[in-house]
Amino acid sequence: GTYEYVIRGYQMARVWNFSAGPSCLPEDVLKECAAEMMDCNGTGQSVMEMSHRSSAFEPIIQDAEAMVRKLMKVPENYKVLFVQGGGSTQFAMVAENLGIHTGKAAYIETGVWAKKAAQEAAKLGVEVTTIASSKDKGYSYIPKVEKIEGDYDYAYICFNNTIMGTHYEYIPETGNIPLVADISSCVLSEELDVSKFGLLFAGAQKNLAPAGVTLVIIREDLIPELDDCRPGTPTMLAYKTHADNGSMYNTPPCYTIYVLDKVLHWIEKNGGAAGINKLNVEKANYLYDYLDNSDFYRATAEKGSRSLMNVPFLTKYSVAGATDEAVLAKEKEINSKFVKEAEAAGLVNLKGHRLVGGMRASIYNAMPLAGVKALVEFMKKFAEENK
């Protein structure tokens, strides 16, 4: 299950990392970063030490933006921003900057992150309407909302839901209502028509980079003057602050942006969004096919709503609605045994989210097919030994 490489004579075993984020990065990128750690591009310094205003760093952030535009085919009337605070800060920024005309917004609740976003907007005084929810079935599917109408300032969706392993197979029609999407866990895992959205954002630590930077793509006409944001909006939470200052109003997370730039070049080398998507479909199908044909495991997300990135699954010892102590104890025992033995076999971070239980394999862009195959081999062995 593990593969090895050597750094300066130290033998190190790499594990297959199925973490929901921060998650594995492409090995080629890590090697490049290691090689440039002490001296990047002949500057005699590490990117970690560079002044963000220096001629050494400027080309890095400019290239990162250019690569985002190229790979995501971003239309010219959109700004590409690099901000801090993760996806969670975007819950507030979206509300503060977009909820300013009627003060109303429509949210589709497909899980924890969409719900938190709606709660944050409501907290800031936006009149939030939850127009659809999949809570009735434990968020195991994406509700069909083909069309969103009304006097909303914006409509909000979480495009891929990491905890429940669900993903939109369609983009809701919103007419003149700007559509906002959290694409943190699926950015560049597939082709996406940016022009169908008013705003896209992605915390980078799942598919793009280490934690510390959030990518925002916003249509220019949706960026209000600071004074037009909701009352009391802090300067740092206005998109205009970042748009007017080339994402350098204050010190950006330089090193994270540098790694992001390298990951974008790695994606391009692998065929761009379309090429990566082909690989992602192959990986996900390999795992789902095994789960669907197994009498020991089952996937929790409904067909037609399944994520290519996050695959939660249960064993036969997880009984829906069980209250019997013995049954619950057995379930807990099997789950922790699975996680522990997987770890010993070099397959790490497979523990499921407490809301779903069981296990979860996050198989983002950087996870190779070999990692998924290693997981399935382990699952077969575990099923055989514990049936």
Describe the role of every protein-language-model region.
Residues 297-342:
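Conserved PLP-binding catalytic core of the aspartate aminotransferase-like
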Residues 9, 14-15, 337, 344, ...:
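PLP-dependent enzyme catalytic core of the Aspartate aminotransferase-like
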Residues 1-11:
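Short, Lys/Arg-enriched N-terminal segments with co-localized hydrophobic residues
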Residues 26, 204-288, 302:
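Active-site C-terminal subdomain of aminotransferase-like
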Residues 43-90, 97, 112, 120:
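Conserved N-terminal alpha-helix of the aminotransferase class I/II PLP-enzyme fold
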Residues 88-155:
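PLP-dependent aminotransferase-like
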Residues 21, 121, 133-187:
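Active-site phosphate-binding strand-loop segment of PLP-dependent enzymes
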Residues 14-65:
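A glycine-/small-polar-enriched, mobile loop at the entrance of the PLP active site in fold-type I
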